[in-house]
Amino acid sequence: MKNKKFILFVLVPVFVHMFLFSVGPIIAGFGISLMDYNPLRDSNTFAGLKNFKELFADEVLVKALFNTLMFVGITVALNITLSLMIAQFISMFKSNKIRSFFRMAFFLPCVAPLVASSVVWARSIFPTATGLANMMLKTIGFDPVNWLGDPNILMWSIIVFTIWVDIGYNIILFSAGIDSIPTNFYEAAEMDGASAWHKFRHITLPLLGRTMTFVTIMTLISHFQMFAQFSVMVLKSGPQNSGLVLTSYIYKMAFEIKNMGYASAIAVLLFVIIFIITIIQQKIQKVDWDY
């Protein structure tokens, strides 16, 4: 009886917090998306599916959706590939001190606030005249690049920054997954004369199935929701809306144009996209075995 009371004592605050700050806002967002809602008005009218119908005719939304899918697709693919390669490289060292050093070094950017890191990159690395990136290009004979002002380069600049700031978290997860694989699998493979590539391909990669699923889903969700770097680095959606993504468009519609009903409809669209991709990802990477 005491154990049940303790469990309730621990779980009830968690569920209350989850409902107030997760489930509640989602339900409220669905409700607001069906209204012509402006917080500055005394009364707001029910609009039905009007906001959702406008989604299909909004060319700016189409551009934001394209930018979002491009950003997420490239960053997630590069993030997972590079973090797995780096984690595998770190696991090759026998010394725990060396492995811990590399893990700490790669994880440090994750500790800094994302807004602060975005400001540092925007003001110290990417500026056309005085930025570190262009200074390095000049030393090897290349012309300076307008990293945050060229519509063809802006998104790639943010992709590079996002990978730098976010890759350390997945390196830690993959390193933990690799360390948990029993060494007898590798010992048996060495006795059979397997190369390092074959051990990675036929042992490490398959046995990281659950870790890979978790990392992929969490990275997808977090990158779909990223907002800080676009808010800091991109000036007014960027040239030709090249830096506009769904999260920044939601913010613009809700807090600049004050059309929260339409902003909520875009948020519902983003929620549906994330939900569908997560379900598909779970089906594709489903793992039914254990070791």
List the model feature ranges, each with a label.
Residues 3-291:
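A structural signal for multi-pass alpha-helical bundles of membrane permease subunits
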